[in-house]
Amino acid sequence: MVHLTTALDPASAVPLYEQLYRSLAAEMRAGTLTAGTRMPGKRRLAAELSVSVNTVDTAYQMLAAEGYLTARERSGFTVQEYLALPQGVQPPAARSAPVAAPPADAAPPVQFDLSTRGVDPGLFPFRTWARLQKELLYSAPELLTPGDARGDAALRQALAGYLAEYRGVQCDPEQLVVGAGLEYLLGLLAPLLPGPAAVETPGYPRARQVLENNGVPCRCLPVDADGLSLTALSASDAAVCYVTPSHQFPTGVTMPAGRRAELLHWAARAPGRRYIIEDDYDSEFRFDTRPLPSLQGMAGADGPVVYLSTCSRSLAPGIRIAYMVLPRQLLGAWQAKYRLYSGTVGRFEQQTLARFITEGYFTRHLARERTAYKARRDALAAALRASFAPEELTLAGLHTGLHLLAQLKDPPLDAALRAAARQYGVRCSLLSDYDLTGTAHSAAGTLVLGYGSLPDADCAAAGERLKKLCTAAREASDTV
């Protein structure tokens, strides 16, 4: 006769059938119920446990589905042979709860978010976006079916038109690939690249990480007043160059036309064996001068430039839509490698963005954003100039993008600045955070201040708080 140690708790939030299933499975794993043992009949066990027959039947069926029991006609359920887990391995139900780590010192709440990735959610066109999505939900049920892995044709057509008009990009819709984020697209591109990649330093750490994670060695090359150093590039073994020419991240430098031409000549000296990846970061937000055309536009549709951009800044980071323009010579390799892949952006979101662009909402939205962000930039710059003496601070990188640089004269230690920022409830980064070599010292004492998510009303207070934290950091540095 089988003696079960099962105890059920009717007050538990776990259903009775689930409790019974777990208990019996544990006994089988422990060897209490051995292979070949005939289980009690459902009615008998239900009576013993004071539960319904359905509860027992459900538990038995779950155990049978997972191979713990086998059902035999007229014989009921019998325990299957169970191979014990290796020593040290426990099934989920038998594991003890993880030991909580000792609590770290709680950081003061962030009062001023000056991170570079922030945008203002209040500028998002909620009403228009919701209306377009609602119309599509009711009128386009075909969007529930799988789409083109490169992105829906309507969106690629809309993007090609927008990029041609506003960024001078020369491409056919067939050259465009839509994906869930720049890092995703860069990761797919990496295996198609011919060799090591030059990356800017200070620069975008994620780009380097994505490339290296996908087998592309990176050469960290310096940035000067005109962008990536062509002297350093020519002396390297790089076959690929990853640049942010419209708004170098994080210095804010714009690569002039002459340097862009030199870069294209570098690639042209080895056709098919050298490529430029143009990350058109923050090109939408140029406040005081007209933007230069894209590198891709200078090179043409048959040129060696891969163009990358994203909607995370112009719309919102949560709308995971990025896009890439491939050179024609890479289309065959792309198709061969990724033809069986599925798209990573929902079709309703793609079609919403396509209509948002083609019906003129996108350009109006960008104009509204530029006006709002320019006013915020001016307010933050004015607050910094009011809080710091001219001999204490120099501002740079003001003309493009959603962040600026505050270069401290006679700067405190960067470690002291980081600690003071945490203490004073300010989230920001330092230029040295983007040094990809870990050896440069010229960037010390430079704050990288994003104002995308900073409320307009907080600009003056942010300037005052930054002054306080810099003073505290300097005092801390003097005691070292």
Regions found by a protein language model. Name each.
Residues 1-134, 141-144, 330, 335, ...:
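N-terminal basic, amphipathic alpha-helical segments
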Residues 133, 140-272, 284, 288-302, ...:
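Conserved core of the PLP fold type I
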Residues 217, 275, 426-427:
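Residue-level detector of anion-binding/catalytic polar loops
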